[in-house]
Regions:
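Active-site-proximal alpha-helical
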Residues: 306, 449-555, 564-568
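Beta/coil-rich, acidic/histidine-enriched accessory regions frequently appended to metallopeptidases
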Residues: 12-30, 35, 131-137, 520-648
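Beta-strand-enriched, solvent-exposed domains that form extended recognition/catalytic surfaces
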Residues: 122-270
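Bacterial N-terminal signal peptides
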Residues: 1-7
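Intrinsically disordered, low-structural-confidence terminal and linker regions
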Residues: 11-133
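Catalytic cores of extracellular degradative/oxidative enzymes
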Residues: 284-493
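Exposed low-complexity, polar/acidic, P/S/T/G-rich flexible segments that act as propeptides
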Residues: 245, 251-302
Length: 648
């Protein structure tokens, strides 16, 4: 405390004083009153960062922070829109942009610490109308609503029932339900919900882009742009200085059912609903829904959801077929893994952003592996493949969705069999022939099942009767390769999709009985037996051929006999056919190499895989290698079919 004219007044905490002083010095620098050197700006930025949790604590600090930002926006221009920061800038300073980084910290601090339920009420007069002008870049510009008296009423699914079967990634996190409403930057929206949702873990999310980008080396938008307000009363006031779509977060095991939510002082955004309880008609879409001004559009069914920029879709004509196609793909995935077609939340949730959320493609809720340029002019009818449907180009999406399903695998298959879902989508969902579906599932439509088998049979490991290499090295013969999951597609070719569906369904049933299998190292012999049980045939020779050998073949054979699982003539015939495909001279090998490397084979690549491996073997492969491969395959045939072709 300090004494002032005989009165006792409460002094600002030291942290507030330092924070205020730092922001004041930055403002004076912007106005040219007291110029700072780069290092001095960095010093003030460090003080702000250290005290950032106090930036939303008082009316004075919030007002000062917005005043500082407004000063910068008037003088230089908003972040990501001014000349220096358009398109983003490096997170680590290499000289220059010191002030921009400091103001980035201020903006992020306001979002993180000023926009809380208590502060919206306590500092409403300050926050009402307070907006970041960078919002015109991301998430997008939109005019303020016509007035708080305009109320939109929407239906949402306020239930998220318990999941059935083995755990799936993000199944127990809150489900996100679009409302078709958008909060304009600077506005305060009031959301009214039924009493059944109060104090039950529900929330209101403003801004769909929920991934935290703080680890990204390049800053292209604020790291955290989405704010969640817990629903603790029938009416909740929400705000976000960037604006954002309004969503209801439904907690796991919530059971409020279909409810109606009222939203006041928001603008509408395009929302195509293919949900069972609320379907947007094509006429509604064309005449009104796609024309709403909110900068992000939502598409949602009971099985699939995505957000894309409104600039992509305001002339898009047929979301009905699009969503039917996405639902078809979701059904193919659910059937493959023996899961119900309608789950506790959508099977897949996709979101476009200005940057990948990770340093590569990742699964997630949402899966955010799709970039756009917010400053690029669009025609309202984007040719992005997300709007062409999953049959267009979905191999990456379904690879990541495979990871998200946490299903059981043989050892070493983690980065191989996750491509299988897209084979099912294309073949079972859209009637693409199996070979083409297999090839496209890992972006190489020229790799058929037979070519994948040859890619395995020409290796030294096959000739020597060894399993496929699953080491963590470039010599690995399974990960990111068609031959690594060819065994599953082979089962489909011979027996149809049902054995795989029944197998993974049995894994779910076992889980419900308390029996769990290691998802990335399912015991080999147990897995072969259970897969054989689902196929109604002894799959040992087929799986052995594809590089996974039984650990105790004698014991496994007894188990097969005990269950009446007999050798299959289909497998026998297939192995004999593969014997005829083995290249028997250098010319045959060269033709195979050309097929699986259609762009040519360049020298200088790693000699242990891919082009590099073929570059090494092109001059070396000869008849002796072909004969050794034939002998190795004959050993497999003799081991499992000692009496020749089975009857049947």
């Amino acid at each position: 405390m300090v004494l002032l004219l005989g009165s006792i007044v409460q002094a600002e905490p030291a942290s507030d004083t330092d924070l205020s002083s730092a922001m004041d010095q930055l403002k004076k620098h912007i106005l040219g009153v007291s110029a700072l050197e780069a290092e001095q700006i960095n010093q003030q930025a460090a003080i702000i960062l250290e005290r950032i949790d106090r930036i939303g604590a008082t009316a004075d600090r919030i007002s000062q922070a917005f005043d500082l930002l407004a000063c910068q926006e008037r003088t230089v221009g908003p972040l990501f829109l001014n000349e220096a920061t358009r398109g983003g800038f490096p997170r680590k300073s290499a000289g220059g942009l010191e002030l921009d980084r400091a103001l980035f910290t201020v903006q992020q601090g306001l979002i993180d610490h000023a926009y809380t339920p208590d502060h919206i009420q306590k500092f409403r007069s300050i926050l009402d109308g307070a907006a970041f002008k960078t919002s015109s870049c991301f998430p997008g510009a939109v005019d303020m609503p016509s007035g708080p008296t305009v109320v939109h009423e929407v239906a949402i699914n306020a239930s998220q029932p318990p999941c059935w079967g083995i755990p799936v990634m993000d199944n127990e996190t809150p489900a996100r339900r679009p409302t078709g409403c958008y909060l304009a930057p600077g506005s305060i929206v009031e959301v009214t919900v039924p009493p059944s949702m109060v104090g039950k873990g529900y929330g209101i999310r403003v801004g769909a882009h929920s991934w935290d980008l703080r680890e990204k080396p390049t800053i292209v938008r604020l790291d955290r742009v989405s704010i969640v307000y817990p629903i603790e009363a029938i009416r909740t006031a929400v705000a976000n200085p960037l604006g954002g779509g309004i969503y209801i977060e439904v907690p796991y095991r919530a059971d409020a059912g279909i409810v109606r939510v009222s939203i006041a002082n928001a603008v509408r955004a395009p929302f195509f609903s293919a949900r069972h309880f609320d379907r947007t008609t094509l006429d509604q879409w064309k005449k009104s829904e796609r024309r709403h001004p909110g900068p992000w559009a939502d598409f949602e069914s009971d099985k699939f959801m995505m957000q894309v920029p409104t600039q992509w879709i305001y002339n898009f004509d047929d979301p009905v077929t699009l969503m039917e196609d996405w639902d078809t793909a979701m059904d193919a995935v659910s059937e493959l893994f023996g899961l119900p077609p309608v789950r506790c939340k959508t099977v897949l949730y996709l979101q476009v952003d200005v940057i990948f959320r990770g340093n590569a493609n990742y699964p997630g809720y949402p899966q955010s592996n799709f970039r756009y340029d917010p400053l690029k002019a669009e025609s309202g009818h984007s040719n992005h493949w997300l709007l062409k449907g999953p049959q267009s180009s979905g191999e990456i999406i379904f690879h990541e969705l495979g990871h998200a399903h946490l299903f059981t695998k043989f050892r070493g298959e983690v980065e191989a069999v996750v491509n299988l879902p897209y084979v099912a989508v294309l073949n079972r969902g859209f009637g693409v022939d199996l070979d083409t579906a297999f090839g496209r599932s890992f972006s190489k439509p020229y790799v058929s099942l037979e070519q994948a088998a040859i890619m395995w049979m020409v290796t030294e490991n096959f000739r020597m009767g060894r399993p496929m290499d699953i080491s963590n090295s470039p010599a690995n013969e399974v990960r990111y390769q068609h031959r690594g999951y060819g065994k599953y597609v082979e089962i489909v070719r011979l027996f149809g999709w049902k054995p795989l569906q029944d197998f993974w369904h049995s894994v779910n049933l076992d889980y419900l009985k308390g029996i769990e299998y290691p998802r990335n190292a399912d015991p080999t012999d147990s897995r072969i037996l259970r897969m054989s049980r689902a196929a109604g045939a002894d799959l040992r020779p087929l799986i052995h051929f594809w590089g996974v050998h039984p650990e105790d073949n004698a014991a496994l054979e007894k188990a097969m006999t005990k269950e009446g699982l007999k050798p299959s003539p289909l497998i026998y015939d297939r192995l004999l056919h593969y014997r005829t495909l083995i290249p028997m001279n250098n010319a045959h090998f060269a033709r195979h190499a050309e097929i699986v490397n259609p762009k040519g084979i360049r020298k200088g690549k790693n000699p242990l895989y891919g082009e590099g491996w073929y570059s090494v073997w092109l001059p070396k492969y000869e008849e002796s290698h072909g004969r050794a491969a034939q002998a190795a395959l004959q050993e497999i045939i003799d081991l499992y079919f000692p009496e020749g072709r089975p009857k049947g």
